[in-house]
């Protein structure tokens, strides 16, 4: 079951990346659009579509019933591929607008795919397999894009549609496979809490109930998503690829994937949900602190391109994937929350992609001629500091909140037992 479900989820989202991210391998050198850098504008337009999908998804994913998931997947991937064909057909710069619909169609796919595997005793393993698709797929998408352009000599505008055409039928087949997964058992529900849809009132109540820690996590994730998007979309501008294989990205991301798989794999042996939350956040703090140190001391450390990219990728993805895979599933189970992981993931993504658009627009309008490496290192350094503080505070809050709720549960149990004894004595003959 684990290989079936986890493998299908991993491959499914990897193919979503094949429909969404290959264009990032192209540099579009010398192209401008409406007075702005062409690639920056393509990225902003696609993210705007993605952003709107995330906003709609806060409601849609929270309420999406299981019988409608497959229809949603099929409609999304068909629109995504059609938009890539239009990107190749239409003349630049007007083809940019096709990428808006590409982002719009794929913005909720993570939440939909995750809904197939959440709320199970095996979710930690399944989510780990699913989550690594983000790491490995990003590098593979760029490497395949470079291969198609450099070896097959396909143009920058048609390369995404060609890759998407191969991905679409495979993704439809995997969607069907996920849709055939059995529902969580009663034992799954007992250990991980039943996953239910949330209406607007319930979403607001959930946020109010955990507002301090959710604000900390949402703000920190806002910064992480911005940093990850800039790294993924502009890596070919950040580092000098001359002298390196076009498969460098895939090779580094594969090693990072194996390390994170091993780290997150240890969580399977920890039954206590609060212990898992503390361990995960501690790993995240170590990652963000390392990321900040390496970035702010880039000139002093004199690291090679490969070493720098490996450390950045590992540190960033430990933090990012923690919240995209395991954290909220354990959070729901720990505090017996009635809800689903999709609500949390779509919310943090919506907030994060909003930040990405604002940062790119600020860069384009106020500082168009920048050194991408310096820009990234400065941002990575300060993001690392802020996130280290935010996640450390989150650990303190969660531990204290859990202790408080355990005391309340113990108190209620004692009261109920006392009432039962009193009732028993009251019916005894005098």
Which role fits each region the language model picked out?
Residues 123-150, 166-167, 345-359:
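Glycine-rich segments within core transmembrane alpha-helices of 12-TM secondary carriers
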Residues 40-61, 255-266:
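Central cavity-lining transmembrane alpha-helices of secondary-active solute carriers
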Residues 4, 30-45, 211-216, 236-259, ...:
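Loop-to-transmembrane helix entry
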Residues 415-430:
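PAS/LOV and related PAS-like sensory modules
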Residues 84, 93-109, 302-322:
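Hydrophobic core of transmembrane alpha-helices in multi-pass small-molecule transporters
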Residues 23, 107-122, 235, 318-336:
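Intracellular juxtamembrane helix-capping segments at the cytosolic ends
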Residues 149-217, 241, 270-272, 398-412:
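Intracellular loop-helix junctions on the cytosolic face of multi-pass helical membrane proteins
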Residues 75-92, 265-268, 284-301:
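C-terminal ends and interior cores of transmembrane alpha-helices
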């Amino acid at each position: 079951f684990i290989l079936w479900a986890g493998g299908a989820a991993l491959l499914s989202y990897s193919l979503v990346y094949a429909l969404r991210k290959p264009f990032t391998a192209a540099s579009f050198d010398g192209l401008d659009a409406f007075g702005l850098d062409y690639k920056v504008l393509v990225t902003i337009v696609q993210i705007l579509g993605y952003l709107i999908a995330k906003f709609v998804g806060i409601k849609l994913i929270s309420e999406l019933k299981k019988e409608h998931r497959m229809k949603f997947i099929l409609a999304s991937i068909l629109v995504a591929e059609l938009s890539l064909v239009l990107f190749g057909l239409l003349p630049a710069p007007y083809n940019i607008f096709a990428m808006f619909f590409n982002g719009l169609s794929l913005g909720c796919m993570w939440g939909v795919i995750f809904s197939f595997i959440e709320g199970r005793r095996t979710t930690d393993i399944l989510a780990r397999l699913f989550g690594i698709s983000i790491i490995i797929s990003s590098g593979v998408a760029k490497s395949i894009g470079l291969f198609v352009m450099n070896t097959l000599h396909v143009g920058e505008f048609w390369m995404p549609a060609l890759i998407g055409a191969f991905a679409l039928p495979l993704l439809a087949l995997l969607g069907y496979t996920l849709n055939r997964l059995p529902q969580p058992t009663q034992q799954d529900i007992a250990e991980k809490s039943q996953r239910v849809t949330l209406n607007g009132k319930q979403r607001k109540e959930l946020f109010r109930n955990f507002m301090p820690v959710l604000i900390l996590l949402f703000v920190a994730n806002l910064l992480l998503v911005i940093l990850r998007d800039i790294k993924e979309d502009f890596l070919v501008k950040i580092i000098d690829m001359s002298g390196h294989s076009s498969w460098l990205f895939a090779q580094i991301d594969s090693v990072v994937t194996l390390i994170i798989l091993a780290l997150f794999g240890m969580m399977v042996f920890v039954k206590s949900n609060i212990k898992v939350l503390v361990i995960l956040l501690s790993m995240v703090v170590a990652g963000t602190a390392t990321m900040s140190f390496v970035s702010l001391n880039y000139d002093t450390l004199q690291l090679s391109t490969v070493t720098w990219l490996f450390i950045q990728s590992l540190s960033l993805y430990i933090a990012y994937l923690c919240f995209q895979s395991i954290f909220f599933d354990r959070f729901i189970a720990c505090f017996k929350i009635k809800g689903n992981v999709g609500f949390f993931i779509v919310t943090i993504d919506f907030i994060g992609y909003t930040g990405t658009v604002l940062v790119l627009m600020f860069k384009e309008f106020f500082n168009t001629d920048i050194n991408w490496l310096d820009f990234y290192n400065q941002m990575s350094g300060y993001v690392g500091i802020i996130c280290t503080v935010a996640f450390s505070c989150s650990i303190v809050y969660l531990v204290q909140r859990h202790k408080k709720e355990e005391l309340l549960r113990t108190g209620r149990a004692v009261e109920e037992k006392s009432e039962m004894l009193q009732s028993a004595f009251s019916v005894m003959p005098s």
